[in-house]
């Protein structure tokens, strides 16, 4: 669905202003640092660490919560009713460049199990929100009919490939593709320090590689279901892959000079996105892809396609 830029732009400006205001305080920066180090803390613990009163802390927490940086919840498991604070955002990306063709965007989501091609090697497996699909470390189950419902998959090397839906209007060319997905490495068990070189391909052309730092299991993922094993991958990092006329970027950092113009894509084009851990990579550390029922972000693989009229 096309997004009209004027109203959306005003909303984004207001959101950005609130975030900058929230970060304009040494105390609030210290709160963020403490929550990064400790994952979660109650109000009493934070106030003691910061040497301020609970009343003063409440005002700071409200500002951080209002712009989505911090979440609060009530925990009545201990003595009394404690308010627990956790960090909601792990990154803030500031894009000072005006969005290109922002009024013409097609958005879609791909479930983790909707791959159209794969070649994977153990350790590997996949699961829906409620159960494992078949047995782990048996690649045959990547062809099981239930795999379309998969919300998480993992493998030590190989690839999965997705067909990107292209339903932009006729007589339009593609000017940018943005992919957003929660990813991590795949270690035997869990290991927060387990680098893996994950390469991204568009229509069989490598557009760049990102090194995942680890396979994270120190705390349970926010959306990871209760039945999931505690010593298995719990959450990943939300990565934003963008290819446009300037190159290919991960989280705003350029990873290659491959541009969208190299593909000459329009409303008739088919597009395939491959995520791979290659045999010849420096770090062959596997790949885990998290869907909306696992990890920390509650989303599937999101795709945004910017388009503009084809010039005659």
Model-derived features: where do they sit?
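Single conserved hydrophobic/aromatic residue that forms the stacking wall/gate
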Residues: 1-8, 12
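Short, cationic-aromatic polyanion-contact patches
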Residues: 21-25, 42, 75-97
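Amphipathic alpha-helical dimerization/coiled-coil segments
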Residues: 90-154, 158
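Short coil-to-beta strand junction motifs in C2/discoidin
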Residues: 191-202
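A short beta-strand element within beta-rich, extracytoplasmic domains
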Residues: 173-192
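Alpha-helical residues within the helix-turn-helix
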Residues: 48, 65-66
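Short beta-strands within extracellular/lumenal beta-sheet-rich domains
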Residues: 151-172, 255-259
């Amino acid at each position: 669905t096309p997004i009209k830029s004027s109203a959306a732009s005003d909303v984004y400006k207001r959101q950005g202003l609130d975030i900058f205001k929230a970060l304009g305080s040494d105390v609030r920066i210290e709160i963020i640092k403490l929550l990064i180090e400790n994952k979660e803390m109650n109000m009493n613990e934070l106030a003691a660490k910061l040497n301020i009163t609970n009343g003063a802390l409440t005002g700071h927490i409200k500002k951080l919560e209002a712009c989505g940086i911090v979440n609060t919840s009530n925990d009545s498991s201990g003595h009394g009713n404690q308010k627990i604070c956790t960090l909601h955002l792990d990154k803030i990306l500031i894009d000072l460049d005006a969005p290109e063709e922002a009024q013409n965007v097609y958005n879609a989501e791909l479930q983790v199990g909707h791959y159209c091609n794969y070649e994977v090697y153990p350790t590997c497996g996949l699961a829906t929100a409620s159960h494992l699909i078949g047995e782990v470390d048996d690649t045959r189950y990547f062809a099981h009919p239930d795999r379309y419902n998969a919300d998480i998959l993992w493998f030590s090397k190989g690839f999965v490939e997705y067909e990107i839906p292209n339903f932009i209007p006729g007589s339009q060319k593609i000017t940018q593709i943005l992919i957003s997905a929660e990813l991590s490495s795949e270690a035997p068990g869990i290991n927060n320090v387990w680098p893996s070189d994950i390469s991204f391909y568009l229509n069989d052309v490598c557009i760049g590689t990102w090194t995942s730092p680890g396979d994270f299991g120190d705390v349970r993922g926010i959306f990871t279901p209760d039945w999931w094993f505690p010593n298995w991958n719990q959450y990943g990092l939300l990565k934003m892959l963008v290819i446009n006329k300037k190159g290919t970027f991960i989280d705003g950092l350029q990873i290659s000079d491959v541009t969208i113009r190299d593909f000459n894509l329009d409303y008739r084009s088919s597009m395939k996105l491959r995520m791979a851990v290659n045999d010849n990579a420096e770090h062959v550390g596997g790949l885990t892809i998290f869907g909306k029922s696992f990890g920390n972000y509650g989303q599937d693989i999101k795709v945004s396609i910017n388009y503009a009229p084809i010039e005659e």
